[in-house]
Amino acid sequence: MGPGWAGLLQDKGGGSPSVVMSDTDSDEESAGGGPFSLTGFLFGNINGAGQLEGESVLDDECKKHLAGLGALGLGSLITELTANEELSGSDGALVNDEGWIRSREDAVDYSDINEVAEDESRRYQQTMGSLQPLCHTDYDEDDYDADCEDIDCKLMPPPPPPPGPLKKEKDQDDITGVSEDGEGIILPSIIAPSSLASEKVDFSSSSDSESEMGPQDAAQSESKDGQLTLPLAGIMQHDATKLLPSVTELFPEFRPGKVLRFLRLFGPGKNVPSVWRSARRKRKKKHRELIQEGQVQEEECSVELEVNQKSLWNYDYAPPPLPDQCLSDDEITMMAPVESKFSQSTGDTDKVMDTKPRVAEWRYGPARLWYDMLGVPEDGSGFDYGFKMKKTEHESTIKCNIMKKLRKLEENSGVDLLADENFLMVTQLHWEDDIIWDGEDVKHKGTKPQRASLAGWLPSSMTRNAMAYNVQQGFTATLDDDKPWYSIFPIDNEDLVYGRWEDNIIWDAQNMPRILEPPVLTLDPNDENLILEIPDEKEEATSNSPSKENKKESSLKKSRILLGKTGVIKEEPQQNMSQPEVKDPWNLSNDEYYYPKQQGLRGTFGGNIIQHSIPAVELRQPFFPTHMGPIKLRQFHRPPLKKYSFGALSQPGPHSVQPLLKHIKKKAKMREQERQASGGGEMFFMRTPQDLTGKDGDLILAEYSEENGPLMMQVGMATKIKNYYKRKPGKDPGAPDCKYGETVYCHTSPFLGSLHPGQLLQAFENNLFRAPIYLHKMPESDFLIIRTRQGYFIRELVDIFVVGQQCPLFEVPGPNSKRANTHIRDFLQVFIYRLFWKSKDRPRRIRMEDIKKAFPSHSESSIRKRLKLCADFKRTGMDSNWWVLKSDFRLPTEEEIRAMVSPEQCCAYYSMIAAEQRLKDAGYGEKSFFAPEEENEEDFQMKIDDEVRTAPWNTTRAFIAAMKGKCLLEVTGVADPTGCGEGFSYVKIPNKPTQQKDDKEPQPVKKTVTGTDADLRRLSLKNAKQLLRKFGVPEEEIKKLSRWEVIDVVRTMSTEQARSGEGPMSKFARGSRFSVAEHQERYKEECQRIFDLQNKVLSSTEVLSTDTDSSSAEDSDFEEMGKNIENMLQNKKTSSQLSREREEQERKELQRMLLAAGSAAAGNNHRDDDTASVTSLNSSATGRCLKIYRTFRDEEGKEYVRCETVRKATVIDAYVRIRTTKDEEFIRKFALFDEQHREEMRKERRRIQEQLRRLKRNQEKEKLKGPPEKKPKKMKERPDLKLKCGACGAIGHMRTNKFCPLYYQTNAPPSNPVAMTEEQEEELEKTVIHNDNEELIKVEGTKIVLGKQLIESADEVRRKSLVLKFPKQQLPPKKKRRVGTTVHCDYLNRPHKSIHRRRTDPMVTLSSILESIINDMRDLPNTYPFHTPVNAKVVKDYYKIITRPMDLQTLRENVRKRLYPSREEFREHLELIVKNSATYNGPKHSLTQISQSMLDLCDEKLKEKEDKLARLEKAINPLLDDDDQVAFSFILDNIVTQKMMAVPDSWPFHHPVNKKFVPDYYKVIVSPMDLETIRKNISKHKYQSRESFLDDVNLILANSVKYNGPESQYTKTAQEIVNVCHQTLTEYDEHLTQLEKDICTAKEAALEEAELESLDPMTPGPYTPQPPDLYDNNTSLSVSRDASVYQDESNLSVLDIPSATSEKQLTQEGGDGDGDLADEEEGTVQQPQASVLYEDLLMSEGEDDEEDAGSDEEGDNPFFAIQLSESGSDSDVESGSLRPKQPRVLQENTRMGMENEESMMSYEGDGGDASRGLEDSNISYGSYEEPDPKSNTQDTSFSSIGGYEVSEEEEDEEEQRSGPSVLSQVHLSEDEEDSEDFHSIAGDTDLDSDE
């Protein structure tokens, strides 16, 4: 047999086809031919060598590839056939033409190497193969598999299997297969048990490597292996060693050349050689494998029988005897391994099971349920986990082959494969490095702390000796300490150390070496790691003296037992609960971790998937409004009937009512058809708004018991009806059937109260709330009318539900909270996304107006912020003024949009704003109901008002927190929606009990009981035992107790009796507060009581009375109760005291009545308790009285009678009605309730008396203690502070109080002194010292001790008295330092903006627009050189050439200083940048081009906002308005505010008379009038002439004369006001006359225009005054040379100059150069004609000169400086056409001819301090003179409105009352806002006015 055959057979055992042939074959094949190739038949004829004949179409490469295809098995089939023919004649190997080589002489004969037990039989079988070829031989069972496999391979060899880590059993069979014809060989094998680890080896790789090694090397390695494993291999003959067992057979864990693991070799039960272990099991393994093989082997054997028909030998054997028929061999019994008693036969033996049924222990363990489901029998037979056994072969042979191949691979490849030992943990860690061989080596190193205590003492720098080490480790040196009884080293796990646990690893469930048996948990009581029981008592401490806690606990243990027996305290279940519960030993699944947690809200029972309608999910407009005003919020969920403007119902008259029965049936049929068409089943029909109508489907009515529920659904949202049912214990009949809803069986209640067994409660449930509902029968007379625009529809109603109190499941956000703001933002974003989806344009686009219309309360900036995320604003092109969707932005899908905002979030937000509106209507400000911070929430809850506490954001948060266990609810209180105790109050209270804060008497200061008779430590044992006998404790129990146990029982029982108010020895009571457990229990009981009460009341079908008389009587009772409560609050008396006083008063009154009447016959009509005799019922209504006699029983048991007399007719009627209509039971309950109330009062009285008694005793004890100390002087109650006003000198208010008469005066010098007065110092001394009771001065002998507080207060008074306060008006104007020109951080930080700035100030708005334009110019590319001023050090000659430098930073600072009242001045300075660049750099320079682009951008921005800027400029300068009415109203308003209101003591006429203070004023005065009303009329332009204005002014005087009389001081003040008004009007007579004339002319022109417009539609629009009316040839225009301001045609002007000649002149005059140059070039300017109004407003020459010289005095108060433009048009068209040519318009500082003291407008400071004046003012009516660049001052300044002072509170009130004003705007600088002496009138412009 040659090596080639070995290679072939090894390939059949699982090798790769590429190495089937020998080296010679490989060489020939590589040459191109290869062996006999059967594949050549596919492409033509082949020659004798098996190659294609002739020149075929295939080249050499294709032929090679074709030869390679022979690996599919065709070539091997022919090779085997030919080989069989040649082998039939001879045993030796033959040389084949195809390259099969002959065996070498020195080849090892593998056929002799065999297993020990089968050597003879195999050799016999081999030699007798030719004679006995039949299968059924004597020993045929052993090789049944191998023979059939071999024959099967001869007929049709299988294709080679793919390489893999595991091979099938059939391939493994081929390795050791033996052919009976002699061609099969047996590879050498070593007997060893199978190892699961060997199966992991890659068979293909090992076989490949072995084939590549060559047969000679393989044989050598095998012989070397044999020498290592066979016994005496080097001494005995080779054949003799084969007959002896090998080392691996005796010791399966032996590895040649490896480290011996003695625990594995000689472990427990493993030290006996396993020689006999496989002696009897060999045949059985084969038999088991045959049984498991089944049908496959039978088919193979049938094929073998057909082939071997000539073999006629048959052997008949008797069946093997049963095991019980044979005697067991003692040696086998002794040497056999100990089998597990729990294991069962898995088919590996032939013995018959015992007839007795045997129950496997694991069968009825914790997995019994699963075994029952799988049908496993009791004995557990046949249970295999679904695993499959592998087909058993000679495992030792396979394992030997695998090891041999691995070694060959390792030797050839040079790669060292990791041995098994390398994977042990001991080889993974470098534990050798941690061994301390010498203590000196680690002396200077620190040992590892976790190992130091186990290693013991080692000398180091820290622990030089053992004592120091013990101290460091915390050990004590005493030997008496208890040592631990266990080893300090961890305990070894014997199963891990000695057991073969790795055999139980499942490597392949389909290829198991044996079937695993279910393990049984066994607890070893000797296992030190197991704690099998809990110790009963706590272990004593290790110290010699027990601790105080342990002593106390042991001593109090008996007293607790006694108190539990007597029933004083309950047995404490929490101690038992604290112990761990005994777990089921079979419950190994950690079920406690899967139980539902109680932290969250109680989950909804059953499925709670709420599917809203499509319109609701998409938040469509009618159902989910984007904005709700105050009216809609007040009508929230209570919509009024809508009045239709069109449709059938818009017309009056009778309308028919349509029935809906047919429509309902028709709609139901249509929906059923639709459902059937879609395939049946459930279907969702609420898809469109039309589906939400009430005209079809089933309807129910639900009436909510709460007036304003915390949460309400919107239209289209779904709600489920759940029927909660709690089963009865034992046999339960099931839940009753309900018409609506789904039944849910609940064990724990989803409500605050629990359900009773057998109780069913229906509930509304959705994502917002859960609320119980109660079905009521609808009266048959009721029906439903549906009103639409088309008509009326009627339908029936069957059922109505009453909805109980809601249990919120969704938290309502607080106002202005983060959640609310986030919802507003997301809601707006969702609306924008839906608008884009609706857009049909491409790209999609929307308008800002659509969003502003839907969200009017949102500012444009917030909307723009949302839009910028997804869209761009287009200013030009096709999409101009549209927001176009960004190209790179993906619109969210519908599902994503729905996820952003849910309908529940909208409902919560609506509930919040509706409640907010209700609170505002009730008078609460916004700050009062802000949501509190979380950490201070409990304190905040105690401080807020009751109405705010009932707001939904507070109640829902409280309920949800209570459900999570974070707090408790108040249950009864202000948040009860019913108001009568039938609902829950959702207000947070802490979990721990707190002292009740009722309106009781103030409790006295609790003093310590130490040293008093209430001190339990002073109570003798004898007295204590006597107290116990009084308490009823048995004598035998008392004897068992020690002293402190007796004291404990006394204290506990006294406390219990003191709580109930009955304890005679309550002085020994301690800790009257409830424990947490009692508090929780009372809370649950109270919740259950209210829950049951609510169910009873709301489910009641009793019809309530609606009698008006009874309700009025009840109202009167409520009023009386309210008065009683007020009295209680004022007097701080208890209700018992009040009732006693009231009874005493009634008794005395009755006595007086009896004495007055003189009749004593009323004593005959006696009735017992609560019975009455009614007298004089038939008397007249005026003289009726009711006498009620009541019999009482006092504390001693004596009876006495009291008589009550009632004279109120309503009370008499109510009493008689109750007596006549109600039965005795009702009256008894009513009286019983009253009796219960009295009983509570009685208990309260006892408690208070006991406290008073205790106080008296304590006071007496204090008197007896020592000499009476001097009592502190009793301080009188501090009266109200008598503050003296600093302005008027009156007492009772301060100068900042608006009740001060001089509060509104501004021109009068302040009368408050600079320093503090003596009276103020005295008042301050009283206020500084807070604690009046503390003795501040003590006299001890000759020493006087001053209190620390007294010294501190004196220092504080002295410090405050030294402060001098100067009014700002009296201070000289400060010169502010000019800010440097280089502000480095200008573009890094935004400027600080005051939070108090006026929002509606047009100057601020204009400045913000201009600043945004500056930002846009700054963002242009390459504009950096113009951002900041030019550095003079870098560019030294710049300021020599440029005299007026300008840059963007300076421009920004000017804007922030409000220096630009118009865009023309702003543009002029920007144009100055361009001119400077052209002057210095040249007109063609790149920097000049960049500056020109900045100017172009500015012009573009100004043109975009042309209309808005024009309106702002008009608002800044009202006198320049086109309308003369505005100027007229402006002058009148200044007369009122600065002249009439400045009259001393005129404050009573400033505002309307308060009706509360003067109740009869409006009865006397029919037409009231005041200065504020006049100002309102002025702002509304109601006065178009002075006559109408004077009529109202005179009406003030007439009203004062009428009400106060002509001699009253008020009348004199009113007369002075009228005189001032007449005087001022006379001064402005000429100007006002011209304005009246112009207003009248404009009116007439408007009327004429209206008439002409009706005739001729082409008539031009507004009236244009004619030149003769406007011009006066005698006037002249004075020109200021420096006032060169560039203005465009859109500048505001007082007059219009439509003359074409004037425009031409102005255009020529303006020029396009610098202002100064233009003046020099043109010389004199032709003066245009001025109007009469212009002439009136011209200043005198002297004043003009003063203005030009800049020499205004501080006392100068010019009326105003009007900015006039000579441009003739305000139209946008003309301004656009004239934009390139900027006309030069001259501005004049004009003022009316008035005296200085009569002026209405004043400068703030002189001309030199112009920058301060500009900062302080928003209004500029004067010209702006360019400052000298070298100076810090300006020639002129803008004036601001001075005079009339108004407080901020009054401004707010005025704005709320009268709305915004149009007169003036003043912005206070920060300095002036901080000053309390400067106030300015500030109204709003007509831009924001609604009027």
Swiss-Prot record:
Ranges of biased composition (kind: Acidic residues): 1711-1723, 1741-1756, 1846-1855
Modification Phosphoserine, positions: 328, 1690, 1693, 1799, 1802, 1820, 1847
InterPro entries: Bromodomain (IPR001487), Bromodomain-like_sf (IPR036427), Bromodomain_CS (IPR018359), TAF1 (IPR040240), TAF1_animal (IPR011177), TAF1_HAT_dom (IPR022591), TAF_II_230-bd (IPR009067), TAFII-230_TBP-bd_sf (IPR036741)
UniProt motif (Nuclear localization signal) ranges: 1372-1379
Biased composition (Polar residues): 1690-1708, 1830-1840, 1858-1867
DNA-binding stretch(es), residue numbering of this chain: 1216-1294
Species the sequence originates in: Mus musculus (Mouse)
Location (main, coarse): nucleus
Subcellular location: Nucleus
Protein's UniProt name: Transcription initiation factor TFIID subunit 1
Cross-link (Glycyl lysine isopeptide (Lys-Gly) (interchain with G-Cter in SUMO2)): 570, 583
GO cellular component entries: MLL1 complex; nucleus; pronucleus; transcription factor TFIID complex
Residue intervals of the Protein kinase domain: 1-435, 1446-1891
PROSITE patterns, A to Z: BROMODOMAIN_1, BROMODOMAIN_2
Residues carrying N6-acetyllysine: 565
GO MF annotation, one: protein serine kinase activity
Record gene name: Taf1
EC numbers on record: 2.3.1.48, 2.7.11.1
